[in-house]
Structures are given as C-alpha cells and as structure tokens.
Amino acid sequence: MATRSPSVVISDDEPGYDLDLFCIPNHYVEDLEKVFIPHGVIMDRTERLARDVMKEMGGHHIVALCVLKGGYKFFADLLDYIKALNRNSDRSIPMTVDFIRLKSYCNDQSTGDIKVIGGDDLSTLTGKNVLIVEDIIDTGKTMQTLLSLVKRYNLKMVKVASLLVKRTSRSVGYRPDFVGFEIPDKFVVGYALDYNEYFRDLNHICVISETGKAKYKA
C-alpha cells in the first residue's frame, strides 16, 4: 500500500536567516523579514523528492501536470532530477508534461474561490498516471477542487507533489503524497512564489515584511 512520504518540518519558532547572509536583489531588501529556506536546501530536498516520486510512480509513463504560475520553478527542478534518475537507472520511464493555471489568492489570503484560467483540455489525461506539481498547499481547498476536477477523467493514478505545506487552522486537512517542507502559517515568497506577481525572481524562500505587503498590495 502506498504511503505519503515524510517532509522536513520547520517549527513555528524557526528564526530563519538574516538577509545580509545571502544575495538578495536590492529592490527587495526592505520588503522581506528574513530568508526562511535557502535555495541550496530547496534543491537538495527537491532531489530527494524526485527519488521518492520515481520509487512510487517509476513503473509507469507519467504525465507531469504543473500548476502555474507559482509551481513552475519547483516543477522544472523536480523534473530535471527525475530526468537525471532516468538517465542513470536501469529502469527508465517516458514522461510528458502539461500545464494548468489556477487563481485562488488576493493579496495574502486564499479566497477559496478556484478559477481555472488556463491549461489544455484535461480530457487528455484520461487513463494516464498523473503527477500534479504545486508550489504550496495552504488551506488545501484549491488542490481538493483540482483533484475533483481531474478525477472526472478516469485517471489511472494521480499523485500530488507540493514543495510546501502550511500549518494553518484554515486547513481542510488535505495532505499531498510528496511534501518538501511543512512550514508555519507565514506568508512566504520567492522561488517563484509570488505576492501579487512580485518576488518570483527571488531564489530563496523568504518571509515578506509588512512593508512589502503594503508596497505591493493589489
């Protein structure tokens, strides 16, 4: 029986790292409180998740479905590691990619209203083994809605990999199959996670400051 893989749990009192210890774009220095997860740690953890995905799904042709926009960096890096495992293993699998775009945030709050604003015809997923790749699970409502949508197409298998899962009282209890980091209820940006489209160009995952929220508020 398949089990959900463990995650790196970051405690509520984790202090993070001073911005001065890392290379931060000057235009964001006043907008961030701290570096929360350095880029190198993200990459090492993603490499391990790739191994977990291959162990769980590696006997099948996989359709990797990227949730845009925030998931694109994690998606690209995860697939690079999976491709490396494919190249260096006796057992390799074909993989194809597809994309879907959802919208559920306004400023720093998940609205609970899920809008599908892009993506190809999901009927192409019928009978396939699908790996959905997401940047962050907050309340879990977005992913539950997406799963209910794709399951209408009689998938052979569906698994979810999320770089982050947030501990929050607003959670509906959903937990992905593969999780990079479990984090406190803080609004984080960087590594393609955005605040109203800003901060996607930041390599590290950081905690946004109140100054940053005010500056980039919609």
Swiss-Prot record:
Q: Which UniProt keywords apply?
A: Acetylation, Cytoplasm, Glycosyltransferase, Isopeptide bond, Magnesium, Metal-binding, Nucleotide-binding, Phosphoprotein, Purine salvage, Transferase, Ubl conjugation
Q: Where is this cross-link: Glycyl lysine isopeptide (Lys-Gly) (interchain with G-Cter in SUMO2)?
A: 115
Gene Ontology process terms (BP): GMP catabolic process; GMP salvage; guanine salvage; hypoxanthine metabolic process; hypoxanthine salvage; IMP metabolic process; IMP salvage; positive regulation of dopamine metabolic process
Describe the family membership recorded for this protein in Swiss-Prot or TrEMBL: Belongs to the purine/pyrimidine phosphoribosyltransferase family.
Q: What class of enzyme is it?
A: transferase
User: Which EC number(s) does the record attach to this protein?
Assistant: 2.4.2.8
- Tell me the residues on which Phosphothreonine occurs: 142
User: Which lineage do the record's taxonomy fields give for this organism?
Assistant: Eukaryota, Metazoa, Chordata, Craniata, Vertebrata
Q: Which residues carry this modification: N-acetylalanine?
A: 2
Cofactors:
Mg(2+)
Q: For this protein, what is any one GO molecular function term?
A: nucleotide binding
| Active-site positions on this chain | 138 (proton acceptor)
**Which Gene Ontology terms of cellular component type are present?**
cytoplasm; cytosol
On the tree of life, the source organism's domain of life is Eukaryota
Give the position(s) of the covalent cross-link described as Glycyl lysine isopeptide (Lys-Gly) (interchain with G-Cter in SUMO1). 115
- This protein is called what? Hypoxanthine-guanine phosphoribosyltransferase
Location(s), subcellular: Cytoplasm
InterPro entries linked to this entry: HGPRT, Hxn_phspho_trans, PRibTrfase_dom, PRTase-like
Gene name for this UniProt entry: HPRT1
Binding residues for Mg(2+): 194
Q: In which pathway does it act?
A: Purine metabolism; IMP biosynthesis via salvage pathway; IMP from hypoxanthine: step 1/1
